A protein has these predicted regions:
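Intrinsically disordered, low-structural-confidence terminal and linker regions
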Residues: 1-24
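Nucleotide-sugar donor-binding catalytic core of glycosyltransferases
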Residues: 16-84, 95-98, 103-104, 110-113, ...
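Short beta-strand/loop segments at the ligand-binding rim of alpha/beta enzyme cores
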Residues: 46-48, 125-134
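Active-site charged/polar residues at nucleotide-handling catalytic sites that mediate phosphoryl
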Residues: 85-86, 151
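Structural motif
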Residues: 89-90, 131, 155, 283
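Catalytic-core regions built around general acid/base machinery
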Residues: 116-128
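Nucleotide-sugar donor phosphate/pyrophosphate-binding loop at the beta->alpha transition
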Residues: 133-147, 184-187
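A conserved, positively charged/aromatic
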Residues: 146-156
Length: 303
C-alpha cells in the first residue's frame, strides 16, 4: 500500500547515511567506506507467492528468492526434522559451492558432490511427491562437475541456453529449462544513497568489483585489460576515477590485481555493501569468463 511504501522509504532514508566525500578520497583499503544497504525483512513484507520451498543456495540467491517464497534452508543432517516441522511444496537446489552458509560445502558440486546426504534427501523427498529442482548457474564451465547431481532431480534448469541439449542427451529426458539470473526489486532498485543531509549523494565515477584470474580465463583477462585500461587512463581527468573492489584481496597471488590496476583497489565488499556500491557509481564495469553463450552473463550485470 501507499502507507507501507512510505514507511519503508522513511526507514531506508534514516538508515542510509552516505560516507563523506573526503572519506572516499582516501586510499585506505577499508571496505567500511561503503555502508551496508538496509535489507527489507522478508518476514515483514511477506512472500510474493504462497509457496514453501526447501532451499540449498548461496547467499545471493537465498536473499533474492527469500522475497518470492517462504524459504526453509535445509541442512545435511537436520532436513528430515525441518520438513516434518515445516512441510515444503518444492525442493530448490542451486549449484552452490558453499550452500546455506557452508552447511553443504562442496556437497552439491565439487569434490564431494553429490554427497550421500544430498542423495538421501532428494530421493526421500521425491518419494514423498515433492517436486525437486536443480538450478545450475555454473554452466558451461562446471557442467561435468554438476551432471551427476543433476541426475537426482525431477527438473533441471541452466543459465546457459547452449547447454540444454547437453542435458537432454546426458539425462535422457526433456524436463530441462533455462533459468537466467534475475534482479530482485526489493533490493536491486534505483533508490538512491543519501548524504548526511538526507539528499541524494553525488555519484562517484567508475567501479569494477570482482576477481582477477592470473592463471585461467585468458579471454576474460583480455576483457579486463581493455576496460580497466580505459578507466585507468580516464581517471586522471575524473574527480574520483576508477575504484576496484577485489573479492580475494590479500589472498593467493594468482587472484591479486597486478600493476597498474592494484593502485585502484579500495578493498573488498560484503554483499550488502555491494548493494550500496551499485547505487554509488555512474558506471559499473563488468567482464565475463563465458564468451560464447546466448544467455549466460554475470549476475552482477542484471543486479
Amino acid at each position: 500500500s501507499g502507507l507501507t511504501g512510505l514507511r519503508e522509504h522513511l526507514r531506508r532514508r534514516r538508515a542510509t547515511a552516505w560516507a563523506r566525500p573526503r572519506q572516499w578520497a582516501s586510499k585506505r583499503r577499508d571496505r567500511t567506506l561503503l555502508p551496508d544497504w538496509p535489507l527489507p525483512s522478508p518476514q515483514e513484507t511477506g512472500p510474493r507467492h504462497d509457496v514453501t520451498v526447501g532451499v540449498i543456495a548461496d547467499e545471493f540467491t537465498a536473499l533474492a528468492l527469500g522475497y518470492e517464497w517462504r524459504s526453509v534452508p535445509l541442512t545435511p543432517t537436520g532436513w528430515r526434522e525441518q520438513v516434518e516441522q515445516t512441510p515444503i511444496d518444492l525442493l530448490f537446489v542451486e549449484s552452490a559451492w558453499h550452500g546455506n552458509d557452508d552447511a553443504w560445502r562442496f556437497q552439491v558440486i565439487g569434490s564431494q558432490g553429490p554427497s550421500g546426504h544430498l542423495r538421501d534427501m532428494v530421493t526421500a523427498l521425491r518419494d514423498r511427491g515433492v517436486p525437486t529442482v536443480f538450478w545450475n548457474k555454473e554452466d558451461p564451465a562446471h557442467y561435468d562437475e554438476s551432471i551427476e547431481t543433476a541426475r537426482l532431480f525431477d527438473w533441471v534448469f541452466t543459465t546457459d541456453e547452449a547447454m540444454v541439449e547437453h542435458y537432454r542427451r546426458d539425462l535422457g529426458h526433456d524436463r530441462i529449462g533455462i533459468l537466467p539470473f534475475a534482479a530482485q526489486p526489493a533490493i536491486h532498485n534505483p533508490i538512491r544513497l543519501l548524504d548526511e543531509a538526507g539528499r541524494p549523494a553525488p555519484l562517484r565515477d567508475v567501479a569494477f568489483a570482482g576477481t582477477y584470474f592470473a592463471h585461467k580465463y585468458p579471454e576474460r583477462r583480455e576483457q579486463m585489460e581493455i576496460v580497466l585500461a580505459g578507466a585507468h587512463d580516464a581517471s586522471a581527468r575524473l574527480p574520483h576515477g576508477l575504484d576496484i573492489f577485489s573479492r580475494y584481496l590479500g589472498g593467493d597471488d594468482t587472484y591479486q590485481f597486478p600493476p597498474p590496476w592494484d593502485s585502484h583497489v579500495r578493498g573488498s565488499l560484503t554483499y550488502t555493501q555491494m548493494l550500496s556500491a551499485y547505487r554509488a557509481y555512474a558506471v559499473f564495469l563488468n567482464v565475463s569468463s563465458v564468451v560464447d553463450s546466448p544467455s549466460m552473463l554475470p549476475r552482477r550485470v542484471i543486479e
